[in-house]
């Protein structure tokens, strides 16, 4: 069975491309922004891997992933950014274990796939809670 992966982005075209390119390898769930991601997690339980864009309206990807990680430490978080700056503390987030990886956009589908597979391997068999307590941003 394919592993569940939640992708969060505020651009529909990016989400459609992810579903098209990675939908055969993973059980892909799409969220159009952080609020929808939280709603999905509250309804479906936590995901083994969450991939989020950095720059989104209202709540940025780093804040979203930090919130997810606080409630479910076993979730592997990957951040996509089209900006080279780490003003949000990207290096510290990697060192602290908050993020598994930061990838630059545009990210080739194969590189994203390999990174997700590596995150799943690094998770070392720890399954996230199927239904963690509800939380909000």
Where are these regions (language model features)?
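Helix N-cap/capping motif at the beta->alpha junctions
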Residues: 30-39, 61
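Short amphipathic alpha-helix used as the core "switch/output" element in two-component signaling
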Residues: 39, 62-74
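Receiver (REC) domain active-site loop signature in two-component systems and cognate sites
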Residues: 56
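Two-component/phosphorelay signaling modules centered on CheY-like receiver
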Residues: 12-30, 97
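C-terminal output helix
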Residues: 104-116
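Alpha4 helix (beta4-alpha4-beta5 surface) of REC/receiver domains from two-component response regulators
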Residues: 63, 84-102, 114
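Active-site residues of response regulator receiver
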Residues: 9, 53
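Hydrophobic/aromatic residues positioned on beta-strands within the core alpha/beta folds
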Residues: 80-82
């Amino acid at each position: 069975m394919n592993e569940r992966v939640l992708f969060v982005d505020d651009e529909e075209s990016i989400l459609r491309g992810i579903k098209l390119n990675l939908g055969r390898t993973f059980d892909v769930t799409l969220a159009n922004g952080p609020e929808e991601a939280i709603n999905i997690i509250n309804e479906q339980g936590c995901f083994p891997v969450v991939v989020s864009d950095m720059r989104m309206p209202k709540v940025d990807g780093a804040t979203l992933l930090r919130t997810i990680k606080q409630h479910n430490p076993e979730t592997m978080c990957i951040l996509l950014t089209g900006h080279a700056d780490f003003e949000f503390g990207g290096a510290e987030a990697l060192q602290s274990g908050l993020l598994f990886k930061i990838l630059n956009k545009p990210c080739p589908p194969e590189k994203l796939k390999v990174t997700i597979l590596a995150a799943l391997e690094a998770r070392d068999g720890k399954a996230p809670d199927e239904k963690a307590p509800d939380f909000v941003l």
